[in-house]
């Protein structure tokens, strides 16, 4: 039995999505870290997550996107010392930004479900392979082998499921859906 229910405002949906995107990013990074460990990697999770990026040649794709955007706006070349902070900020910003978009869309639904995150993760994955080649940061999708694409898709599905589940939990908490005391665990 519901005692009270608060509606989700657009701003609350955006913030919930932003937070859910952070959780989804943690889930995706956990998936990738476990693959790294299975392949023989020895670093701790934090050392792996925040491994120094000493130059743009070592920067992951989110960092290269950030570099291209900043250099485009400022018309100045970013020095190598910015490779690590830009890559880290872009990675977490990208994950939380997509989560905010998820929050806006899922927040407009009557009853968003955690599994809605799966098609969301697939959409993020497919947009990466559509947009990043145009920016010169990825090869066209047909130039990747099936194993690389499958691993990357799986990581994005994990991201989507983590984002969808976190959004569902956050919005249930926000809306104040509770049960009557006699139905509570241990009552």
Where are these regions (language model features)?
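Short amphipathic, positively biased membrane-proximal segments
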Residues: 1-187
């Amino acid at each position: 039995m519901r005692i009270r229910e608060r509606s989700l405002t657009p701003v609350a949906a955006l913030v919930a999505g932003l937070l859910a995107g952070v959780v989804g990013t943690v889930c995706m990074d956990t998936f990738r870290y476990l693959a790294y460990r299975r392949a023989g990697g020895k670093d701790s999770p934090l050392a792996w997550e925040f491994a120094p990026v000493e130059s743009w040649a070592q920067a992951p794709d989110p960092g290269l996107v950030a570099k291209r955007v900043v250099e485009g706006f400022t018309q100045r070349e970013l020095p190598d010392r910015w490779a690590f902070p830009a890559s880290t900020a872009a990675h977490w910003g990208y994950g939380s930004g997509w989560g905010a978009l998820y929050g806006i869309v899922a927040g407009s639904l009557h009853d968003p479900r955690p599994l809605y995150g799966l098609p969301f993760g697939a959409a993020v994955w497919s947009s990466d392979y559509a947009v990043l080649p145009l920016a010169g940061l990825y090869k066209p999708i047909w130039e990747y082998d099936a194993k690389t694409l499958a691993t990357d898709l799986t990581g994005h599905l994990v991201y989507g499921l983590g984002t969808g589940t976190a959004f569902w939990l956050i919005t249930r908490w926000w809306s104040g859906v509770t049960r009557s005391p006699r139905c509570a665990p241990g009552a």
